[in-house]
């Protein structure tokens, strides 16, 4: 099988060259998360108990609330809609997942990781979401008029971008983050 090729590779290589002039820890660190498996599962409200049981078989404690992201040992789950979740990580078998209408989104998304001391400032410029809200950690929003999902972590953000807009959004993020170097 061919090695995964990213359309963002040259952008991030250029960014890395620019950051070599910085000494110490840069204010904004941008990287691409690669080889991440994303499987979307859909279920009806009446199937919530079945979904919860399925997730527990994967080692996940519960079905997260809307706009929540929970991590297990080898897999994570994000509640993207009331009746849709994303499993992020390698599924050992999709046999049990078939009843939840699995859809492989792995090659449909670029994932950009944004961290550093000024990452909060960059995100504030990118989208109109108050990321200080501690009750949610997974947001559906838009950047540059493109629908994206953002996973807010303790010290970083992961931005899930439709692949067809990956390069445009990455350029936009690089432009904004360059103000903080």
Segments (PLM) and residue ranges:
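Basic, glycine/lysine-rich polyanion-binding surfaces/domains
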Residues: 1-181
